[in-house]
């Protein structure tokens, strides 16, 4: 599990078009999926943050076991991206679940902010309430604003809120 201040693990994962993406910093890594109501509720807020912070590389990673949850298969991910259009971040598949494990991801969503030096600076929920769009991913945005200002993140960790990651058995 990666702790606040630790060097973030590197990764290379395929997106919905089969292109590989490797971690570039500074970054926001969001473990997410296609079926969790929490992940779906926060998706637009996270996409808006990706558009508002082009100086950060955003990655959406789906680690769920697609055999038990076919709605999280690479094909279903591809269909979702095509249906919704204009995703401002690559949607990556963590088939082995190794990336989710080394980060210590627990839920969808689970957000990790990595600074330009590759260190984990924030981990947790995008904001306090998935049902309140007016919160606009405020915890994530606060962390990104602190990094932009070269300040310590005031709230470096919050409890991730969402559906448990569906681990392979």
Residue ranges and their predicted role:
Residues 151-169:
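Disulfide-stabilized, aromatic/cysteine-rich ligand-recognition loop
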């Amino acid at each position: 599990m990666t702790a606040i201040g630790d060097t973030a693990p590197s990764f290379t994962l395929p997106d919905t078009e089969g292109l590989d993406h490797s971690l570039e910093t500074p970054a926001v890594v969001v473990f997410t999926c296609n079926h969790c109501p929490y992940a779906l509720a926060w998706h637009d807020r996270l996409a808006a943050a990706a558009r508002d912070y082009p100086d950060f590389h955003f990655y959406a990673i789906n680690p769920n076991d697609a055999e038990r949850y076919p709605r999280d298969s690479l094909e279903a991910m591809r269909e979702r991206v095509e249906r919704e259009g204009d995703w401002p971040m690559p949607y990556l598949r963590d088939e082995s679940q190794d990336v989710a494990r080394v980060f210590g991801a627990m839920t969808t969503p689970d957000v990790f902010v990595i600074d330009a030096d590759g260190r984990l600076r924030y981990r947790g929920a995008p904001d306090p309430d998935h049902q309140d769009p007016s919160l606009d991913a405020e915890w994530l945005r606060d962390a990104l604003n602190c990094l932009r200002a070269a300040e310590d993140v005031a709230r470096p960790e919050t409890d991730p809120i969402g559906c448990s990651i569906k681990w392979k058995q």
